[in-house]
Curated annotation (Swiss-Prot):
Belongs to the NusB family. This is Transcription antitermination protein NusB. It comes from the Bacteria. The gene is nusB. It comes from Pseudothermotoga lettingae (strain ATCC BAA-301 / DSM 14385 / NBRC 107922 / TMO). GO terms for molecular function: RNA binding. GO terms for biological process: DNA-templated transcription termination; transcription antitermination. InterPro entries: NusB-like_sf, NusB_fam, NusB_RsmB_TIM44. Involved in transcription antitermination. Required for transcription of ribosomal RNA (rRNA) genes. Binds specifically to the boxA antiterminator sequence of the ribosomal RNA (rrn) operons. One of its GO terms (cellular component) is cytosol. PANTHER family: ANTITERMINATION NUSB DOMAIN-CONTAINING PROTEIN (PTHR11078:SF3), N UTILIZATION SUBSTANCE PROTEIN B-RELATED (PTHR11078). Keywords: RNA-binding, Transcription, Transcription antitermination, Transcription regulation.
Length: 140
């Protein structure tokens, strides 16, 4: 697993645990940061988590617009957490190609989700990318 893959896995766990345990972001983030030995990874995890929660209303709105016959709250906690992470990356991390974001999200869905999670996540994120990803990301 690459450093960035590991980082995404840990960010997913922060998002998931925050909702599952209903702890503060700071508490969950602190717990997760103890796992990481790399200063760079800690900085990336912190940037992602802060970025996700600072932009959560916009992220959730864009996900919701790409769901067909579903509401965001009806999604499993795993799928919702993955979609939030990947949507943040699609919209706000300009150096990450769209294909990498989708591939990494699918891998997290295969690891933690249900049998159908990876296909569902891929389909929703494809719509998010086509509808909302910055134009310059399409050429990375």
């Amino acid at each position: 697993m690459t450093r960035r893959s590991k980082m995404r896995d840990l960010v997913f766990k922060v998002i998931f645990q925050n909702e599952f345990r209903n702890d503060s972001i700071e508490t969950v983030l602190e717990d997760i940061l103890h796992i990481s030995k790399s200063g760079l990874m800690k900085a990336d995890i912190t940037r992602y988590v802060k970025g996700i929660y600072e932009n959560l209303p916009s992220i959730d709105e864009k996900i919701s617009l790409c769901l067909e016959n579903w509401s965001l709250q009806r999604l499993s906690l795993v799928d919702r957490s993955i979609l939030r992470l990947a949507t943040y990356e699609l919209l706000y991390e300009s150096d990450v190609p769209i294909e990498v974001t989708l591939d990494e999200a699918v891998e997290i869905a295969k690891k933690y989700g249900t049998e159908n999670s990876s296909k569902f996540v891929n389909g929703v994120l494809d719509k998010v990318a086509k509808s909302f990803a910055p134009e310059e990301k399409r050429y990375i």
